[in-house]
Amino acid sequence: MNIMNAKKDFKFKTHTCKIDVLGIEKEITYNNVIWISPNKLWILYANDDGIIQVEKFNDVYCDYPLMYDNGDVVYDGYLNIPKYVKENIKRILNKHF
């Protein structure tokens, strides 16, 4: 799903955090941030190509939410995404697409 297809403009933010990569602390900046979970574990953002991704902080994997015409949202990967994260993503995507 490409952000360029959105009905309304997202209010993007930038988020910088420190992550541990093989014992080395690195600072990473996410651009085009759409939503961050209240516990700061999950982030929904658009990558540089405009593709929406959901990612768990300090993890090397991400997932791509896909929305059907009827508003249902599914995921193409195998991340164990909590229900509250899925519900927020569905609410956000249904509002904008």
Task: For the regions a language model picked out, list residue spans one by one.
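Negatively charged, low-complexity tracts enriched in Asp/Glu with abundant Ser/Thr
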Residues: 2-26
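Short acidic DE-rich linear segments
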Residues: 93-97
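General helical secondary-structure elements
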Residues: 3, 82, 86-87
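Charge-rich, solvent-exposed alpha-helical interaction surfaces
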Residues: 88-92
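Acidic, low-complexity, intrinsically disordered interaction modules
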Residues: 22-84
